[in-house]
C-alpha cells in the first residue's frame, strides 16, 4: 500500500526477492494508498473507540489530493483513486511551490472551492467544475480554490508514516507557510462528548461536512490503504440517517 507502482514492485521482486519488496519505502512520485476512515454518528461512541480523546479535524467538502514534490521541484497531484490531476489544478501546484518548505515531500489535503475575498467555503459542486481537461484558465477564474492540508507522509528523505499523528501534524505545520489558499485543516483536541458535539456544530456552521476524528495516541501511525478505527468520520448525513431511522 505504500507503493502503487506495480512495475517497480515487480522489478524489485525479480531482482531482490520478497525481502527487497518489503524494504520498499514511501518516496515522492509513487502515490501512497490513502488511509480511510470508519464512520459513526454518536460523539460518546467515537471517543470510546479512540481511547477517550481525539483530534477533531474539519471535514472539508472538496477533492482529496496527495501532493508530491519531486527532487527537481515538480509538483504532482494525485486523487485517492490514483489519478493524476496536476494539470487540472495549476493554481494548487503554484501555491505548493511557493508555500511548501521541504525540497521533497508528500502531503495530503483537500482542494476546496474557496472565496478568499470573503473567506467562505463554496459548495462541492463548484470544485467539481474544475475537473476538466480544457478551458483551465477560465475555470481558475470562475472557481478559485484553496488547499487545506491534513497529512505529511514524507519530507526530505524521511518516511513519516510510522510516526504518531501528533508528530505528523507538528511536522506538517512546520512544513508549510500558510496563506489565503494554503492552510492547515482546522483541528481541535477534545476529550468530552459535549466538546466533540460543539466542534461538529462549528464545523457545519463554517461550511464543512463535519469532522474527521483522529486518534492521537502513541499507535496512531498512518495506515496506508486501511479503513480502520484510527480515523472516524462524523458527518451531517450520518446524523440525518440516524434521526430518520
Over which residues does each language-model region extend?
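Electropositive nucleic-acid-contacting surfaces
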Residues: 2-7, 84-85, 90-94, 200, ...
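Flexible, glycine/threonine-enriched loop-and-boundary segments that flank and lead into catalytic domains
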Residues: 35-56, 60, 193-199, 215-245
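A short, structural micro-pattern
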Residues: 103-106, 141-146, 205-207, 226-228, ...
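Metal-assisted phosphate- and nucleotidyl-transfer catalytic regions
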Residues: 174-224
Amino acid at each position: 500500500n505504500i507503493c502503487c507502482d506495480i512495475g517497480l514492485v515487480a522489478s524489485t521482486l525479480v531482482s531482490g526477492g520478497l525481502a527487497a519488496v518489503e524494504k520498499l519505502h514511501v518516496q515522492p512520485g509513487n502515490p501512497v494508498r490513502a488511509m480511510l476512515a470508519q464512520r459513526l454518528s454518536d460523539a460518546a461512541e467515537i471517543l470510546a473507540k479512540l481511547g477517550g480523546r481525539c483530534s477533531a479535524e474539519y471535514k472539508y467538502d472538496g477533492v482529496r489530493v496527495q501532493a508530491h514534490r519531486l527532487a527537481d521541484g515538480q509538483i504532482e497531484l494525485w486523487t485517492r483513486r490514483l489519478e493524476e490531476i496536476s494539470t487540472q489544478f495549476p493554481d494548487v501546484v503554484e501555491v505548493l511551490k511557493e508555500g511548501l518548505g521541504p525540497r521533497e515531500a508528500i502531503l495530503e489535503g483537500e482542494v476546496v472551492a474557496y472565496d478568499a475575498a470573503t473567506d467562505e467555503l463554496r459548495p462541492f459542486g463548484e470544485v467539481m467544475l474544475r475537473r476538466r481537461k480544457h478551458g483551465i484558465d477560465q475555470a481558475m477564474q470562475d472557481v478559485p480554490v484553496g488547499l487545506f492540508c491534513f497529512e505529511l507522509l514524507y519530507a526530505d528523505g524521511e518516511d513519516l508514516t510510522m510516526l504518531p499523528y501528533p508528530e505528523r501534524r507538528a511536522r506538517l505545520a512546520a512544513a508549510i507557510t500558510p496563506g489565503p489558499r494554503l492552510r492547515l485543516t482546522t483541528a481541535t483536541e477534545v476529550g468530552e462528548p459535549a466538546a466533540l458535539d460543539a466542534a461538529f456544530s462549528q464545523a457545519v456552521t463554517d461550511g464543512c461536512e463535519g469532522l474527521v476524528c483522529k486518534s492521537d495516541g502513541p499507535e496512531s501511525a498512518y495506515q496506508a490503504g486501511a479503513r480502520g478505527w484510527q480515523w472516524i468520520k462524523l458527518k451531517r448525513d450520518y446524523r440525518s440517517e440516524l434521526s430518520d431511522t
